[in-house]
Amino acid sequence: MDRKTRRANFKNLQPRLTRSTKAAADTLSLSNFFATPENAEEVPSCLADIPVQPDPPAPKIKPIRTSNVFEKPGPKPKKAPKLKASTVSTSSGARRGRGKSKQQPSISNFLRNEQIFAEVTAQHCMADNFSADDIEMALALSKSESEKHGRLRLHDDDDAVVDLLDDEEKSTERIRHKLQKYGFRTAAKEDYKSLAVLPVVASKGGRRGKWANRFTSLTLRNPDVQQKKLEEKVSALLGQEMRGKEPNGEDCCLTPYTVITAALKELRAEGESRILREPSEGPIDDLESYYVTDLFEVSRTPAHHLLKNWAAIQGRDFSPERETQKCRQLRQQHELVYAELERYYGDPQKLEEEVMQELDELEKLVADNMIEDDSVVINIVEAESSSTGSSPSKEPPDKRPKMTMEDKENLQPTTSKASLTVPAQSTRCTSPDLFADSEDEPDIVTTAISNEPEDVRNLSMKVYKNVSISERSSSVAEIEIVSSNDEPSQITTYEVFSSDEVKTVSNATQEKISFDDDFIDLTQEFDMVEFNESKPRTPNLIASSETDSNVDNLNGDTILDFSSQEVSCPISKELYAKYAKVETFPVWNAAAEEEDKIEFSLSMERDLKSSEQSSHQLGILTTPNDTEHSSSFSELNFSRNSLRRSVSLSTDLSFKSPLNWKMNSSAEKRVSPAASPYKQSDASVDLTQNSDDENDAILLSDEEINYSIWKGNKTVKDLDIGDDSSDSCFASPVTKKRAIPQFQTEEDLDAFLMDFSTDGNGSQGSHSPNKSALSKERAEFGILDAAPSQPFSLSELQSHADKEKSSDNEINWAEASFLDAPAKPLSRRSSHKFNELLAKISKPAHNSGDDFDEFDQMVFQSTKEAASSAGETSDMPQGLDLLLKGEIKTTAIPETRAPGNQTPIEPQQVDVDGNVYSVRVCHTPKPDFATLPESEILQQLYKYGIKPLKRKQAVKMLEFIYNQTHPIMKTAAVQDLPARSEPIVRSKSTPVIMERPHSQVAKSTSKTLKAIGTKKDLTFNDATGEELLRFSQSLAPSLCDDFETFVMQTNVTKKTPQPLVPLHIAWHNLICANPQLHESVLTYEPIDLQAVYLHLKHMGHRYDPKDLKTFFDRRCIIFRYELGAPGKQAERHVRRHTKKPSKRK
């Protein structure tokens, strides 16, 4: 079977619709098409491979051809357009032809026609250097012309639209003629043979490949030619020299605007104040001259002032506060106080005289109080100080690890830091350097040695301290060993140990145990058995500790030192004879051998309530020696203020209570009360002591310790070792403690305070010259002096007329730490235990005459006015808004008034369980929430912005809110109290303020405070700033809590003109500017959430309402907001109701 027969058979096997039409391969070439003679009867068509029919339906196919010849290929049709069936006779030939005619021309034939014409056109364009855009425009114009005048203008053959492959009349010349008509320069037939290799689209059955590479006249451009044209146009544009017109002088000088309104004429700039700037003058040097600076004060506050973490909010600022007159005045007072302190303590001669006076008093106190049972226990106060390295203010005490029992038992003997040269004689007892740093110790040692005379340098002091300490924090252990010499100089050495290091240094003379050089070796540490048996004549430093692992109470008194008998001693021999029983030790016999272990012990205060205490007792046991020696107490090592203070650490297991100072000077034993110049400022009010402490003594708060730490940082850099040894009167945490047993009861303390108040007036002249400034400085650290010139006593609470006469004795209570934010980093918390002072003082009966406590005395100008206006409101104390405005005077010299203008009304004092309370009566009784009707309960809940609850829950909630705002003290036994239901006591956070002229506000109000739930009372806009709260520049502790998550604004765009403020800072500023809003938050009144949101939005701070709700909920701030209109909700519900039946139908 040959090929033709096989192909015919295959064609017969195909279905009629899918049978491929006859398409000669030679007709696909353009050269064969043009080579076809014109008079040929049958011309193979490139557009449609329609088989030859007797009468082909030319008019029906021609519109498809003419409409697709010059059109761009559109999207691929899913199916080819169907042609109408021709109505011919049903003969076999006709039926066969009709079957053939159903096969429409393939769309690829139309595309091939367009492709061929595009290729021809592109070839001619390249040959004749025509623009392809011009050819496309000519084709479009020709098509539009044909559509305008009809489908074909057949009467004019010259203007007929070109149809390349129309019928048998067309020939090669006709094609060439048509091409010439459009402006093409035709060539010979042989030139078109290169077009025979056109890219024939091979249909591989894929949809993508079927329509790939369908070129048109626009896509067949030469990219190199187009790039060349583009470069030419760009170079032509760049080559043009565009020179602008030089501006004239009149054009540069822009005339200022003409001010029309009378209000703006005041701001019109004069001719000499105008800034005329030429553009050619260069960059602007001073940009500030172009801005207005006299309208408001420009603040230079750093941007991160109010932020907890500046890295959390990058590039954002906050609303800074200007430095007020009050802050400026406080800063100047601080500078004056610091300068005064430096000038006062820099005078060594004056300090030497004061120390000599103290030594006389010291002998009397030692003789009366230190001798008990012929024994002295020598203790070392290892007071906890917050020093780590060179900065003593880095680690709070509550973060320190505890000292375990193993640490106390494993005290390894090490050697001292260095061997110091000390003077041979000392005639005075100077106060030690309380702020020495361990890092500065070598420099201090070398300086001290170099400053000593030659006869002093040959003396070498043996190492006196050899203890390896690994305690819960950095401990400053201080021991002074002073020999005698003619010069009144002294060297004090310190070792500062942190919790993670143990200092170990070498000493060459450690093994030398002798007393030839007038030294006592305290570096040897032995067990008691070994001490008693093998080395009976060696004084030792024995560390004895009780059986508790938590060292929470380290008590120490003094260090007793042995020195030579020949040198002079500041303590008399009679006093010495009381302690040592013998003046010399010429020969030690068996009786002396038995009495050699005499313990010198001091009675120490013990916290009897807590069993979890232990103390390090370093007992010096006198042992025989071959050389004659007299054990004289050449150094009792009291600092100047240790006569009246002692250090005690709380026995709390968690070590949360800070380091406190105790007042421990008995009035009966003091011989010369005016000897010390510092007893005026030593009685300090304790803000940190718990009420259940049984050590009834006045304790010092941790703010004073912060002051001493600050003083140590300041003095250790400026002064030398001689000046540092006698430091400020507010000495440091490292202070010796002297326990006095007479202070175990309240009566002894009251008697001491009474005696102290009578002695205080005689010793005013020895105090610092600037008493008022000194008290202010201490007040900045949270230290509230009872009085700058005398201790707090009964006379201060009784004689108000005397206090008004002398303004120098006034205390500026407004600068106290409970009225202002803490100013120092270690002010961890302000305690509410201010009434511990009143627990030691009982007030007379004539003071209990009214219902007006100290809190109202601080707030109101006149006590009569306050008493008359106290019944106007029962919601909150009168005048609280004035207190929140911060208008309490802070001037050092208050306004004085005649005492006859008003008679002070004293609040009633009640002594309950040793505590003195001021009582006032709330004029509205407490409602019985359990018996209230439902309507009133719902009204009360709505008042506080609480949703309706069940009755049981609502009663509990209302009871809680009422108890928080109305604290009540139930008294067991009340003396001298009229018939009242229950005395109402001030809250523990309320400060006790005595009647003083300067601590009263200048004006009082009779306006009843209202809830600000309504918009008319919520006045946010305060243009004059009268309502603005004046806080200090320090960070408010509650501004940003630990759980704070920064709530940022939602209008964060690139075009936001103002800085983005976090929500907690914006809320803080809003609270400061609106005292009524502040009061509403404090009194559980609901705030209008919508008003706050709109006000912040008006200021440019837009927050998400959900973030606002979360923010207020986390702070327990009650808010109220209006829901949507109920009419819209009902209407929406009705619409839904009407739609549902329609759907069911």
Curated annotation (Swiss-Prot):
Q: Where in the cell is it found?
A: Nucleus
Q: Where is the composition biased (Basic and acidic residues)?
A: 395-410
Q: Does the keyword Metal-binding apply?
A: no
Among the record's GO biological process terms, what is one?
Answer: DNA replication
Q: Which residues form a coiled coil?
A: 321-372
An example GO CC term for this entry is: protein-containing complex
- Where in this protein does the record put region Disordered? 48-108, 382-442, 613-634, 666-689
Compositional bias segments (type: Polar residues) = 411-430, 613-633, 678-689
Q: What does this protein do?
A: Regulatory subunit that interacts with and increases the activity of different structure-specific endonucleases. Has several distinct roles in protecting genome stability by resolving diverse forms of deleterious DNA structures originating from replication and recombination intermediates and from DNA damage. Component of the SLX1-SLX4 structure-specific endonuclease that resolves DNA secondary structures generated during DNA repair and recombination. Has endonuclease activity towards branched DNA substrates, introducing single-strand cuts in duplex DNA close to junctions with ss-DNA.
Which PANTHER family does the entry link to? BTB POZ DOMAIN CONTAINING 12 (PTHR21541), STRUCTURE-SPECIFIC ENDONUCLEASE SUBUNIT SLX4 (PTHR21541:SF3)
Self-association state and partner proteins as the record states? Forms a heterodimer with SLX1. Interacts with mei-9; catalytic subunit of the MEI-9-ERCC1 endonuclease.
Record-stated family = Belongs to the SLX4 family.
Q: What is this protein called?
A: Structure-specific endonuclease subunit SLX4
Record lineage:
Eukaryota, Metazoa, Ecdysozoa, Arthropoda, Hexapoda
Q: Which gene encodes it?
A: mus312
